Amino acid sequence: MQYIRNIAVIAHVDHGKTTLVDKMMLAGKLFRDGQDNSGEVLDSNDLERERGITILSKNVSINWKGTKINILDTPGHSDFGGEVERVLNMADGCLLLVDAFEGPMPQTRFVLQKALQLGLKPIVVVNKVDKPNCRPEEVYEMVFDLMCDLNATEDQLDFPVVYGSAKNGWMAEDWKTPTDNIDYLLDKIVEVIPAPKQLEGTPQLLITSLDYSSYTGRIAVGRVHRGTLKDGMNITICHRDGTQEKTKIKELHTFEGMGHQKTDHVDSGDICAVVGLEKFEIGDTICDFENPEPLPPIAVDEPTMSMLFTINDSPFFGKEGKFCTSRHIQDRLNKELEKNLALRVQPYEDTTDKWIVSGRGVLHLSVLIETMRREGYELQVGQPQVIYKEIDGVKCEPVEELTINVPEEFASKMIDMVTRRKGDMTSMLNMGDRVDIEFDIPSRGIIGLRTNVLTASQGEAIMAHRFKEYQPYKGEISRRSNGSMIALETGTAYAYAIDKLQDRGKFFIDPGEEVYAGQVVGEHVHENDLVINVTKAKQLTNVRASGSDDKARVIPKTVMSLEECLEYIREDEYVEVTPKNMRMRKVILDHLERKRSNKD
């Protein structure tokens, strides 16, 4: 059993985790000579590649000098806390990857804390030392201090450090002397990370993730905790709620390279996939047929944000998407629940076409919406709401730890913006010409903060936040102050009309786009909502005029991403999401009806 190492990779967004794993796979000869390696094997869905973040964890294994190294990729974002904990449960050690210039970031801290609590042995990799003005020694100190803050044990604090550049494909003991391969790192992994303990006895396997194949159905993935699993043996599945079910393993697979390989038995400590089980959830245990002993299930963080999902009932319903009915959306949400641990879905007040979907944050939910949109779904979502809790009779709300890194001249603006949203500044560090400011801020305050922070700092700010705890309610927070400009009629928007209305605010539509009554087409300069007619064309006469017409000079529209739309809308607005467009609209489309309901 000395020949297996299970290792989780922990890193902040864009510190080069996926690149490093690609290089490790090259070293382990996973690609044939001359095979095209386009990179980013792990971030395999389009969304992950576009945003440069890892959402779903994946398993890869490589062979190095006779030792099998299972590499588990973890999502770096605290919004995907559910994913992180499952992965760490399968590892014996972790690879902490930090940027030689930026140092450890708040997001990394979240995952690292979980890893240290589980007692994993860390190896620190200081990456990107080829960048100009990097500071590897300081970063090493920062990592050490961070580990101390997180109450690491003495054994954990005695961690080896490897310097290198994943992009250029080298790792070494000293950052001043580059080598030409990453062997040093792989040797360190085999040397430092403990081999999994061999536990004799009845078999136990905690299901920590799901795979799905259209041929065999759902596949359970997990690490054999104790004993040996054999192909075709009879087993018991112990569910989280205490019920048990007798069944049989059809096939066992281990991970080889990027694929599966069929095997007849798996010893304790290795990670495998079990085919042929029917009803199981993540957190269930596969145990002995005769006397089952379940393992404790995975504790997953509670959701902190919720959103209303509903079917698309706008005038453009069904024009762009393939799946629009409530049954389609319901099935899709149920499918998502199977593998997305931190998600909750409940029907909204006895309706069949509205759901309250709760998750770990705006990012967690918007990734789900974006994925559905690409699969061809049409739906509408309401404004993100924070989930309140009652603790000892006091109304409490989630509070997050927020870090903003900006050039010095913008620091006062940032502090002003965050304190207005009931944030408290906890520390401020000067790093050269930039400042690192830390706050505690209610989750409500973070909704819509990113856009404002980027505008105020001319796009220079780096912002990261993670859930901290529930604290007593902090009072009202003022939302966006500008009203919306709303289309009066359905039709095509004309440049002539938009041109005449430019001084009223900024537009979210271009001339020639189709709009419908009640759609939010722009942001008003004042606080009240303004209903405008953008579908009005110029009246032409047959009298020849002496002067020439003024040409309509229309300022290009403001383009908003899904997160920005979600953060922008008010309580009485929805975001309509279709595979081709995202539109903002009022819940009540008809102008007169909306007026009446406002009076009530």
Protein language model features and the residues they cover:
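Conserved nucleotide-binding/hydrolysis micro-motifs of P-loop NTPases
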Residues: 15, 27, 31, 77-78, ...
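Canonical P-loop GTPase G-domain recognition
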Residues: 121, 131-191
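A short, contiguous, amphipathic alpha-helix enriched in charged residues
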Residues: 314-337, 551, 555
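Conserved nucleotide-binding/hydrolysis modules and their immediate coupling elements
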Residues: 204-307, 317-319, 482, 491-541, ...
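Interdomain boundary/hinge elements
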Residues: 36-42, 150-162, 196-206, 242-255, ...
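Long insertion/accessory domains within large nucleic-acid-processing enzymes
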Residues: 255, 260-263, 441, 452-456, ...
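P-loop NTPase switch module centered on the Walker A-proximal segment
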Residues: 1-104, 142, 210-213
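Charge-rich, low-aromatic oligomerization/scaffolding segments with amphipathic character
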Residues: 140, 284-287, 356, 362-378, ...
